Amino acid sequence: MVNHLAGMFGSAVGMMSNSRARALEIFTEITNYDESACDAWVGRIGCGDTDRVTLFRAWYSRSNFGQLAGAAEISMNGVGARIPIGGIYSRDITYPINSPLAITMGFAVHEASEGNYTDAMEALEDAPAAGSEHLVSWVRAVIYGAGQRWTEVIDQVRGAERWPDKFLAAAAGVAHGVAAANLGLFTEADRRLTEANDTPVAQACAPVIAWYLAMARRSQGNEESAQVLLEWLQANFPEPKVTAALRDPAYRLETTTAEKIAARSDPWDPSSVVADTSARDKLLVEAQAELDRQIGLGRVKEQIEAYRAATQMARIRAARGMKVAQTSKHMIFAGPPGTGKTTIARVVANILAGLGVIAEPKLIETSRKDFVAEYEGQSAVKTSKTIDRALGGVLFIDEAYTLVQERNGQTDPFGAEALDTLLARMENDRDRLVVIIAGYSNDIDRLLEVNDGLRSRFATRIEFDSYSPDEIVEISKVIATANDSRLDDTAAKRVLEAATTLSQRSLNGKPALDIAGNGRYARQLVEAGEQNRDMRLARSLDFDSLGVDQLSEINGDDMAAAIASVHSRLNIGE
């Protein structure tokens, strides 16, 4: 019987070049008679039968590999069967079935594509190691990629440039780039995938390389290059995600982190991340505590509470499948300097991170110098780099009205270029970026008139009022306490009198207290008062006799001298 089956096998192999259909029929006859005829299963694979059952039977009978071929005096290389091992990286990466290991590789990759990750990994357990470590590493990288375990993909392909199989080494570069992109490491992904485009694997992996390069470049702000790649994909390898990305410039790759991968309750299920909300809850508590600590700012606190409530309810409605108005998260903080705008911006960053709207409670403080360059065409580049630093957090632009300045009655072209870039990124990165612009109300209004699209980008405007004289006193006391200092009653009275005077005077059309800087004015008074106190105490002949009260107290004379000094320095004296 063995000789008969061997004869049938030899006939089938001989027919493969002329009639694969007839060859497949003969290989099938053999396997119907003997399910352990591994070589016939391999023949079926060589004829295009890569059904799961076929792959399983070939793998299950792999210990019989070469027996029929040996009896027929045929080399298994002569069968010419190849098995797909590219997985998510390419349908065109195949490997010659010249050993039981090749069968195992193909079977494991197919099992992973069906979501049977554990079976796939178990199939590799008895794979021969000596001399074939790179093959096993590649298949593991494919399995981990199918399960979106990107950190382990990188572990498997690290050092692939030393693999003896240069084609698979190049494919490993693609796997590394794909993993980097899914981890949000877009610069590294761009580098790896660009290099892969100049290797033997470029054609086999072309759709994957183009897709992830497009997503990496879009996330880096290179929309023009992303569009070129997406259009090429649409023309050659159309699929729904490509169409969606072409239609919506805000379409982004959904990334993860090593921490999230490690937090999965099921290592193969990306949706099984056990959410640890304690850090977010802590951010919300800290944000509320910081807001409560602020003196005055009644209207601001109410508006921040409304902003938080609207954002929180929108997240809850969306989670329950309800319609949610797509309102902008960008904000305007309008008001004089020293009224707590930067502090409240930090509160907003904590709130948004606590609610999961942004990735981290990051606040990037900026001004005109971070956006506007000295040469034409460079402001766009500079602006994009600044925005990239803020992605995943909040970009705070103080004195935003200085972005675009008038020059001899003409609009500043460099500032306009920066503003145009900012507007585009605010829209394209709206899911990863919150922008807060700050400045005097009238100046902010003038900025909003510069560009027609600017005003519509901001759904929330919060007005910051000047501090009252009483609030300046309270702020001064808080600042002093933080420094282990204390204003005596006379010193506090001096601060109240000075603040009242400034609130009733105008300089250049603005309240003198605003020119002085409100809260910053209070800090300068306290710091100058501490200096005067220290100079007074330094004249004491007996330092050991100085008590804590004496070392901390700022008296009326100390503060009177401080007020005179600060007013002179700020040029706001009588």
Curated annotation (Swiss-Prot):
Which GO MF term does the entry hold, naming one? ATP binding
The family database entries (InterPro entries) matched by this protein are listed as: AAA+_ATPase (IPR003593), ATPase_AAA_core (IPR003959), CbxX/CfxQ (IPR000641), CbxX/CfxQ_RuBisCO_ESX (IPR050773), P-loop_NTPase (IPR027417), T7SS_EccA (IPR023835), T7SS_EccA1-like_N (IPR049078), TPR-like_helical_dom_sf (IPR011990)
Where it sits in the cell: the answer is:
Cytoplasm
Q: Which CDD domains match?
A: AAA
A Pfam match is T7SS_EccA1_N
- How is loss of this gene reflected in the phenotype of the organism? Increases efficiency of DNA conjugation when disrupted in donor strain. Loss of DNA conjugation when disrupted in recipient strain No effect on secretion of EsxA or EsxB. EsxB secretion was not seen in this disruption in strain MDK8.
Binding sites annotated in the UniProt record for ATP: G335, P336, P337, G338, T339, G340, K341, T342
Q: Which UniProt keywords apply?
A: ATP-binding, Cytoplasm, Nucleotide-binding, Transport
Its cellular-component GO annotations read: cytoplasm
Q: Which family does it belong to?
A: Belongs to the CbxX/CfxQ family.
Extra remark beyond the main annotation: DNA conjugation in M.smegmatis is unidirectional with distinct donor and recipient strains; mc(2)155 is a donor strain while MKD8 is a recipient strain. Mutations in a donor strain that alter DNA transfer do not always alter DNA transfer in a recipient strain.
Q: What does this protein do?
A: Part of the ESX-1 / type VII specialized secretion system (T7SS), which exports several proteins including EsxA and EsxB. Plays a role in DNA conjugation, in both donor and recipient strains. EccA1 exhibits ATPase activity and may provide energy for the export of ESX-1 substrates.
Subunit composition? Part of the ESX-1 / type VII secretion system (T7SS), which is composed of cytosolic and membrane components.
Q: What's the protein called, per UniProt?
A: ESX-1 secretion system protein EccA1
Q: Please tell me the species this chain comes from.
A: Mycolicibacterium smegmatis (strain ATCC 700084 / mc(2)155)
